[in-house]
Amino acid sequence: LIFPATLNSLFQTADDYYRNERIVTFLRLIRYVAAFLALALPGLYVAAATFHPQLLPGNLIRSMAEARSGVPFPTAAEVLLMELSFELLREAGLRMPGPAGNTIGIVGGLIVGQAAVSANLVSPITVTVAALTALGSFSIPNEELSEVFRLWKYGILLLGSCFGILGVMLGCFLLLMLMAEQESYGIPWLYPYVGGNLNERADEKDSMFLAAARKRKRRPIFAKWGNRIRFRRKS
């Protein structure tokens, strides 16, 4: 079967519809937050540490300065080094057979991060940022979407290291504009956040927030036009 693919559908999983709608709503919010971390956290960290330290609490600035003492690389190079290391570990884990492949990504990341900190190549907070970014990308349900966010992460990191917070915002807006232009079989890729009235706004009840089953009386827009009513009253 071939259906339109939308951003909203790529954040949904099959087991969402076997759980309580409040739990599903919470988990979907976590996925969206994780996607944002996977996309923008490295750029935000570099921008805040390099251009806008006044945005951070004083105690955090002092901790970051103490942690970075002795590190020979600038902040952007630190983050790029750790991100590429995690990408290498991820790729190695995919190529290794059996349970060892699942283990190398987590254990290898901890070992490499600790070794880099001990050698004063990176600071501990940079390892933390890279680990949170990796966890965010793992939390995206769709692997292809996760790869897109991982690729755009480097563009936003470059913009953040050159232009600060403004560069991060510019990168996010460019990605949003590209997504808004896309369509899948005539359906906007940002549906139902864009063009939600195509199905009488029924799909908004199954988006970032999942409404109760009794309120979702219409099937998604992907269903056949004459078969979009889930519940019909007996005549």
Residue positions per predicted region:
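Cytosolic regulatory modules rich in charged/polar residues
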Residues: L1-E78, L145, S184-A212, W225-K234
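Transmembrane alpha-helix detector for multi-pass membrane proteins
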Residues: A34-P53, R68-E144, V148-F149, Y154-G160, ...
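Hydrophobic alpha-helical transmembrane segments of membrane transport and translocation systems
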Residues: T126, A130-S235
